[in-house]
Amino acid sequence: MAQEKMELDLEPDTSYGGTLRRSSSAPLIHGLSDLSQVFQPYTLRTRRNSTTIMSRHSLEEGLDMVNRETAHEREMQTAMQISQSWDESLSLSDSDFDKPEKLYSPKRIDFTPVSPAPSPTRGFGKMFVSSSGLPPSPVPSPRRFSRRSQSPVKCIRPSVLGPLKRKGEMETESQPKRLFQGTTNMLSPDAAQLSDLSSCSDILDGSSSSSGLSSDPLAKGSATAESPVACSNSCSSFILMDDLSPK
C-alpha cells in the first residue's frame, strides 16, 4: 500500500505543466534544470593581510637587526678609541719616566717658600706654583710684594708707662745702694761736713788742753805736729761751706 502511494505521487501531472510534485521526503527545489549546479564550487579564500603582516614583521626585524648592528659597531668603535687613548697615555707616562724631566714640562711643579726661614708665629711661607713648569724668578714682580714677617723679639716695644713699682717697695730702693755705709766719707755732704767740724773742734780742744797742762816737750811737739793737720782739715771744711753757701 505504501509503494502504491509513492508511485502515485511520482506520476507527472499535466495540469501543473510537468513540474514535480513535492514529496514528503525530498526538499523543495524551485527552478531546477540540467544546467543548474546542485553544489557550488569551493572558492579559495586568501587570507587578508597575511602577506602584508609577514612582510611588515620581516621589515621590522630587518630594521631592528640593522639598528642593533650599527649600535654594536658604535660601541666597538668607542671601546677601541678608549683603549687607544689609554695605551697612548700609558706610553707617554712610561716615556716620561724613562727620559729626564725637562724644565718646560707641565708636570713639573716647584714649591719654593717666599722666605728662606719662615716665621714661627705664622707657620710656613706662601707657596708659588708655576703652571708652565718654569721655576719662579728670584726678582719679585712689581705687582706682588713679598714681605717677611718680623721676629717676635724685635716687635716687642718698651712700655710707655715705664716700670711699675711693686707693692711694699720703698722709694729709696730706686737709688743706688752703697756698699760701705759705716764710714763717714760715704755719707751725704752735709753729714760729712758736720762730722769734719766736730772732729776739728775736738782736735782743737785736745791740743789746747795738752799745751796748757803738760810741760813735756814731746807732748808739745805732738800737739804742734797735729795742729797743722787739724787746721788744714778745718780750713778745707770752711772752704767747702763757703762753696756751698748761696751767692
Curated annotation (Swiss-Prot):
Superkingdom, natural source: Eukaryota
Disordered: annotated span: 1-23, 82-104, 129-152, 158-177, 202-230
Keyword match rRNA-binding: no
Biased composition (Basic and acidic residues): 166-176
Keyword set, alphabetical order: Acetylation, Methylation, Phosphoprotein
Residues recorded as bearing N-acetylalanine in the entry: A2
Sequence positions bearing Omega-N-methylarginine: R122
Location of Phosphothreonine modifications: T112
PTM annotation (Phosphoserine): residues: S25, S33, S50, S58, S115, S119, S137, S141
GO MF terms, alphabetically ordered: protein serine/threonine phosphatase inhibitor activity
Compositional bias (Low complexity): 83-94, 202-216
Family of this protein: Belongs to the FAM122 family.
Protein's recorded name: PABIR family member 2
Organism per entry: Homo sapiens
